[in-house]
Protein backbone atom coordinates (compact mmCIF):
# COMPACT_ATOMS: atom_id res chain seq x y z
CA UNK A 1 0.00 0.00 0.00
CA UNK A 2 1.55 3.29 -1.14
CA UNK A 3 0.09 5.31 1.76
CA UNK A 4 2.00 3.18 4.27
CA UNK A 5 5.32 4.09 2.62
CA UNK A 6 4.75 7.85 2.88
CA UNK A 7 6.32 9.72 5.80
CA UNK A 8 3.97 10.73 8.59
CA UNK A 9 3.34 14.47 8.71
CA UNK A 10 5.09 16.39 11.48
CA UNK A 11 3.08 18.74 13.69
CA UNK A 12 4.50 22.26 13.90
CA UNK A 13 4.12 23.33 17.53
CA UNK A 14 2.57 21.33 20.35
CA UNK A 15 1.44 17.76 19.64
CA UNK A 16 -2.03 18.51 21.05
CA UNK A 17 -4.12 21.55 21.79
CA UNK A 18 -7.12 23.67 21.07
CA UNK A 19 -6.66 24.15 17.33
CA UNK A 20 -4.71 22.62 14.46
CA UNK A 21 -4.18 24.69 11.31
CA UNK A 22 -3.83 22.32 8.36
CA UNK A 23 -2.35 23.67 5.15
CA UNK A 24 -0.80 22.72 1.86
CA UNK A 25 1.13 24.60 -0.77
CA UNK A 26 1.72 28.35 -0.55
CA UNK A 27 -0.48 28.80 2.53
CA UNK A 28 2.02 26.95 4.73
CA UNK A 29 4.32 29.96 5.31
CA UNK A 30 1.55 32.21 6.67
CA UNK A 31 0.22 29.28 8.73
CA UNK A 32 3.64 28.79 10.37
CA UNK A 33 3.79 32.48 11.25
CA UNK A 34 0.20 32.37 12.57
CA UNK A 35 1.14 29.43 14.81
CA UNK A 36 4.20 31.29 16.09
CA UNK A 37 2.23 34.46 16.83
CA UNK A 38 -0.67 32.56 18.40
CA UNK A 39 1.64 30.57 20.65
CA UNK A 40 3.46 33.76 21.70
CA UNK A 41 0.05 34.99 22.92
CA UNK A 42 -0.49 31.81 24.93
CA UNK A 43 -2.81 30.03 22.49
CA UNK A 44 -2.65 26.23 22.19
CA UNK A 45 -2.42 26.30 18.39
CA UNK A 46 -0.33 24.14 16.06
CA UNK A 47 0.12 23.62 12.34
CA UNK A 48 0.30 20.65 10.01
CA UNK A 49 1.54 20.75 6.41
CA UNK A 50 -0.05 18.23 4.05
CA UNK A 51 2.45 17.27 1.37
CA UNK A 52 0.61 14.36 -0.26
CA UNK A 53 -3.01 14.43 -1.36
CA UNK A 54 -3.53 11.11 -3.07
CA UNK A 55 -3.09 9.04 -1.12
CA UNK A 56 -3.24 11.10 2.04
CA UNK A 57 -0.32 10.55 4.40
CA UNK A 58 -0.71 8.02 7.21
CA UNK A 59 -1.47 9.09 10.76
CA UNK A 60 -3.79 12.02 10.06
CA UNK A 61 -6.67 10.58 12.07
CA UNK A 62 -4.41 10.06 15.10
CA UNK A 63 -2.98 13.58 14.83
CA UNK A 64 -6.42 15.17 14.42
CA UNK A 65 -7.71 13.27 17.48
CA UNK A 66 -5.32 15.24 19.70
CA UNK A 67 -6.88 18.62 18.84
CA UNK A 68 -10.26 20.10 19.75
CA UNK A 69 -10.71 21.91 16.43
CA UNK A 70 -9.23 21.42 12.95
CA UNK A 71 -9.04 24.38 10.55
CA UNK A 72 -7.94 23.80 6.95
CA UNK A 73 -6.38 26.99 5.58
CA UNK A 74 -6.56 27.11 1.80
CA UNK A 75 -6.80 29.51 -1.10
CA UNK A 76 -9.98 28.02 -2.47
CA UNK A 77 -13.73 28.40 -2.67
CA UNK A 78 -15.85 27.27 0.25
CA UNK A 79 -17.38 24.59 -1.94
CA UNK A 80 -20.84 23.31 -2.71
CA UNK A 81 -21.48 21.92 0.76
CA UNK A 82 -19.95 24.82 2.69
CA UNK A 83 -17.37 22.80 4.64
CA UNK A 84 -14.46 24.90 3.45
CA UNK A 85 -12.26 24.44 0.43
CA UNK A 86 -11.63 21.29 -1.53
CA UNK A 87 -9.04 19.91 0.88
CA UNK A 88 -11.32 20.45 3.89
CA UNK A 89 -14.11 18.63 2.05
CA UNK A 90 -11.82 15.71 1.16
CA UNK A 91 -10.50 15.43 4.73
CA UNK A 92 -14.04 15.51 6.19
CA UNK A 93 -15.14 12.79 3.79
CA UNK A 94 -12.12 10.50 4.17
CA UNK A 95 -11.66 10.90 7.93
CA UNK A 96 -15.38 11.26 8.81
CA UNK A 97 -14.54 14.12 11.18
CA UNK A 98 -17.04 16.96 11.47
CA UNK A 99 -14.61 19.06 13.54
CA UNK A 100 -12.83 19.93 10.29
CA UNK A 101 -13.70 23.43 9.08
CA UNK A 102 -12.26 25.55 6.32
CA UNK A 103 -10.64 28.95 6.43
CA UNK A 104 -10.76 29.99 2.79
CA UNK A 105 -10.00 32.94 0.58
CA UNK A 106 -10.46 33.46 -3.16
CA UNK A 107 -9.13 36.92 -3.98
CA UNK A 108 -5.93 35.58 -5.58
CA UNK A 109 -3.66 36.92 -2.85
CA UNK A 110 -1.80 34.92 -0.22
CA UNK A 111 -3.20 34.76 3.29
CA UNK A 112 -2.12 37.38 5.75
CA UNK A 113 -1.31 36.11 9.23
CA UNK A 114 -3.94 38.41 10.75
CA UNK A 115 -6.60 36.86 8.49
CA UNK A 116 -5.75 33.35 9.65
CA UNK A 117 -5.61 34.29 13.33
CA UNK A 118 -8.72 36.47 13.04
CA UNK A 119 -10.75 33.66 11.53
CA UNK A 120 -9.41 31.09 13.98
CA UNK A 121 -10.33 33.41 16.88
CA UNK A 122 -13.81 33.86 15.41
CA UNK A 123 -14.34 30.12 14.97
CA UNK A 124 -13.07 29.48 18.50
CA UNK A 125 -15.52 32.04 19.88
CA UNK A 126 -12.83 34.53 20.93
CA UNK A 127 -13.91 37.27 18.53
CA UNK A 128 -17.39 38.40 17.46
CA UNK A 129 -16.15 39.36 13.97
CA UNK A 130 -13.99 37.42 11.50
CA UNK A 131 -11.14 38.91 9.48
CA UNK A 132 -12.12 40.69 6.29
CA UNK A 133 -11.10 39.27 2.95
CA UNK A 134 -11.38 35.63 3.85
CA UNK A 135 -14.29 33.26 4.21
CA UNK A 136 -15.25 30.92 6.98
CA UNK A 137 -17.08 27.66 6.53
Which ranges hold each PLM region?
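Short helix-loop-beta junction
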Residues: 1, 33-47, 94-98
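Glycine-/acidic-rich phosphate or pyrophosphate-binding loops and their flanking alpha/beta elements
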Residues: 1-19, 32
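Peripheral docking tails and interdomain loops at the edges
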Residues: 75-137
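Short acidic loop-to-helix transition motifs that present clustered carboxylates
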Residues: 50-58, 109
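C-terminal substrate/ligand-recognition segments
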Residues: 20-31, 38
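Solvent-exposed alpha-helices and their adjacent loops that cap or buttress functional pockets
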Residues: 11-15, 62-65, 93
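Short glycine/threonine-rich loop-to-helix capping motif typified by GTGT followed
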Residues: 33-36, 55-65
Amino acid sequence: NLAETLPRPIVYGDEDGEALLVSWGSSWGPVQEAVDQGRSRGQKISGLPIRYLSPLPPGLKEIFARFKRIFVVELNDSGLYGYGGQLATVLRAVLCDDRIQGITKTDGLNFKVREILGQADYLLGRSPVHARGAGIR
